[in-house]
Amino acid sequence: RKNKNFDRPPDEYKPTFRGMINSIPIELNIDSILIQNSAITYSELGVNKSKSGSIDITDINASIAGVTNMPQQQQRVGKALMKMEALLVGQSRLTTMLSIPYDKDAFSMSVNTTAMDLVKLNPTTKPLAGVDIISGQLHKIDFQMEGSENRANNTLIFDYQNLDLKIISDKGEKKGRKK
């Protein structure tokens, strides 16, 4: 759960995934982890909001492999790899892949979804953004990220149709409609 009513801490250097793994103070060598039939509800309280927005991810099946901070093992496995399939808000198939090579401070990630009724996102968008989704059909989301210590290159395809929104004022009344 995240509360955005607190001041943001000052920006500080944050290591890459490889840096985080390598900073673990004990020798670590995890061959694989399997996660089966799990669920997560992520909630966030927006700035000056009294109600949290949340999103449910269910039917999570994931594998994590090759997590190690031991140089000889890093050389042997080459990279840490995470693959996940899940169900987003009970409708959309969510597929995520994260690859962390051990020979450079970089990573690649992809996130893909299938079709869903966008109204299902209202428990997130109403409390956090003051947006009421009246109607809309998502065909797919394709997100690709290549990141390094200093930069990231991203591609996002958000394929939808017939999106109809209402903006909600801070007092809860409907302000205007956007199509």
Regions of interest found by a model, annotated:
Residues 3, 48, 169-171:
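Outer-membrane beta-barrel translocator domains and adjoining extracellular loop/strand segments
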Residues 41-43, 71, 118, 130, ...:
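Short beta-strands and strand-coil junctions in structured, solvent-facing domains, enriched
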Residues 88-96, 117-119, 164-167:
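Short, surface-exposed beta-strand/loop "edge" segments at domain boundaries and coil↔beta transitions
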Residues 1-40, 111-146:
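Extended amphipathic, helix-rich lipid-handling scaffolds
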Residues 51, 103-104, 116-119, 162-165:
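A short local loop/turn or secondary-structure capping micro-motif enriched for an aromatic residue
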Residues 10-108:
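Elongated, acidic membrane-bridging lipid-handling scaffolds
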Residues 39, 59, 115, 160-162:
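Transmembrane beta-strands of outer-membrane beta-barrel pores
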Residues 99-101, 112, 129-179:
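Extended terminal
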